[in-house]
A protein has these predicted regions:
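Positively charged N-terminal leader segments that act as targeting/secretion signals
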Residues: 3-28, 506-507
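Short, flexible loop/hinge motifs at secondary-structure junctions
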Residues: 20-51, 203, 212, 336
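Positively charged, structured surface patches that bind polyanionic biopolymers
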Residues: 36-72, 87
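Anion-binding and metal-coordination hotspots
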Residues: 41, 110-122, 135-511
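A general alpha-helix detector
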Residues: 54, 98-104, 144, 148, ...
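Basic, short loop/linker segments at the boundary and entry of helix-turn-helix/winged-helix-like folds
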Residues: 61-104, 109-110, 413
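A Lys/Arg-rich helix-loop hairpin that forms a DNA/phosphate-binding surface
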Residues: 90-91, 132-138
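Short amphipathic alpha-helical interface patches used for protein-protein assembly/oligomerization
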Residues: 127-131
Length: 511
């Protein structure tokens, strides 16, 4: 086809290139905006060039790994791990700090596995620089890293790394532990949800069971009731003392988590606490079928032992139980919990429509009927019952919600006054302000962990391995925040930003 005589700007001149050979041999001709011809020579293939290069100059000055190197010290790691290496026998071992750095790279950049981390370090210059390796140095195999953490290093090393980074942030005044936010998030387990078996397991004993039993028996004694024995587990009742669980045959320590109406999967749950600035200050890992309120005590004790100055403890509705409210208030701290709906049958009297008389310890219904305190059960519930004879001729019987015997039954917990105080705190302006911070603190931690650091699912199996995996992930997140904030607060940052327009990231080659 005959070429057009006129060419629009930005296209080749007439008699352009016919073949790839001519394209490589001849220069390019382009029209510029002023109508002139610009010659652009083809760039030479430099993939096989041999050069002397300064590796440090190739890593950008504002790279995350540079910031981490400025805030981290590794001497304590050498001292801690020295007993686990032999210095006078066998072949030279791999530097333990290098192995730990490889794991930090995995969690900092959300790489799913150590195998992929090893592959990326091979051809990523900044990762090699962070490890202290040259372009031709052999990277430690991923199996070496895995073996070190599974067999050689002590099991408490991950907790020590987590605590060390947290203490650094505290010493740099980056933490605000006066406000603690707690919640749990599920992590999909490495287990087929179709491979399971049903097992009967013992019910989990409650930490506060002994204290509750003593207070319940004191009330039952006043009411003339028989005390509840310590070994009363109702073993004679069907299913008493045990509960049937769905147990994975692949990873028995995970738990079946029901997500929505239909989705079911085996998972672990990371019960996490963070401060007002988003630093993770504590974590407990359980199976996915363990309720938040059951795992709360271990997490609360861990955080308050580390930060006794904690003043506000903020949680969602899953933690709104009498025991949690009592323990926090008895410790002199303030629980911040949300509103929860009252459970009652639609079309009947609301629970708050019954008036309580503390002097006589009874309730009065809207029609004036009295509900007396008859007993207190082993769960700590005070049972109030009406007189069936009085209720028989009541005109409001249809909206009362009485049982088949014609009695109206109400129940409150033995520690109900603590929940009432929590409700008063919830209505304060300060309480509303603090609870609104959940979305930018603990919820943000979970979002970053899953979207940026690959915590949505785990390849590890077993509670101990998943616990170490999550702690290292949270340690990396805290380290990243610590490094970034230290960089922002440094004088070098301000100098860098001042000259950033003329800063050119070009390698410096040796002459």
């Amino acid at each position: 086809m005959k070429e057009s005589q006129t060419q629009p700007p930005g296209t080749a001149v007439p008699g352009g290139f016919q073949t790839v050979k001519k394209l490589l041999k001849r220069p390019r001709f382009w029209y510029n905006r002023n109508g002139g011809v610009v010659v652009d020579e083809w760039k030479k293939d430099a993939r096989r060039d041999v050069v002397f290069v300064d590796i440090d100059a190739l890593v950008p000055k504002d790279h995350l790994l540079r910031k981490i190197e400025k805030v981290m010290d590794y001497e304590w790691l050498y001292e801690r791990l020295d007993p686990y290496y032999c210095h006078d026998n066998g072949r030279p071992g791999t530097d333990p700090v290098v192995l730990i750095k490889m794991v930090l790279i995995q969690h900092l950049y959300g790489i799913p596995s150590l195998r992929q981390t090893y592959q990326r370090i091979q051809d990523t210059l900044s990762y090699r620089w962070f490890l202290g390796y040259g372009l031709l140095d052999t990277i430690p195999h991923f199996a070496t890293v895995s073996y070190a953490f599974c067999k050689r290093f002590p099991t408490e090393l991950t907790e020590e790394i987590f605590a060390h980074i947290l203490n650094k942030a505290l010493n740099n005044r980056m933490l605000d532990p006066t406000m603690i936010f707690m919640d749990g998030t599920h992590i999909k387990a490495s287990a087929n949800k179709k491979k399971y078996q049903k097992e009967k397991v013992a019910k989990t004993a409650k930490i506060y069971a002994e204290q509750l039993r003593e207070e319940v028996n004191a009330e039952r004694e006043k009411l003339g009731k028989k005390p509840i024995e310590e070994d009363d587990h109702d073993d004679d009742e069907p299913g008493g003392g045990t509960v049937e669980r769905t147990v994975s045959t692949t990873d028995p320590e995970s738990g079946m988590f029901v997500k929505g109406e239909h989705e079911r999967q085996f998972a672990y749950e990371a019960h996490t606490a963070c401060d007002r600035k988003g630093f993770v200050v504590g974590v407990e890992i359980t199976a996915g079928n363990i309720h938040d309120s059951v795992a709360w005590d271990a997490l609360y004790d861990q955080v308050t032992d580390r930060f006794p100055e904690a003043e506000f403890i903020t949680m969602d509705a899953g933690y709104k139980t009498p025991w949690i409210a009592k323990k926090i208030l008895d410790d002199g701290r303030i629980p911040i919990l949300p509103y929860t709906n009252h459970h009652y049958k639609i079309g009947t009297y609301k629970p708050w429509e019954y008036e309580y008389d503390p002097k006589e310890d009874c309730f009065f219904c809207p029609n004036g009927g009295r509900l007396r305190h008859t007993t207190t059960d082993k769960e700590g519930k005070r049972i109030y019952r009406s007189n069936a004879k009085h209720c028989r001729g009541c005109p409001f019987k249809a909206v009362c919600g009485a049982n088949e015997k014609g009695q109206k039954i109400l129940s409150t917990h033995i520690w109900q006054e603590y929940l009432d105080l929590v409700e008063q705190l919830r209505r304060t302006d300060r309480g509303k302000e603090i609870y609104a911070m959940r979305k930018e603190t603990i919820e943000r931690v979970f979002a970053d962990a899953k979207e940026k650091h690959a915590m949505r699912y785990t390849h590890h199996r077993g509670l101990a391995r998943v616990t170490n995996w999550v702690r290292l992930k949270y340690a990396a997140m805290n380290l990243k925040k610590l490094a970034e904030w230290s960089w922002i607060n440094s004088i070098f940052h301000h100098v860098f930003m001042l000259f950033y327009p003329i800063y050119v990231k070009t390698p410096v080659f040796a002459s």
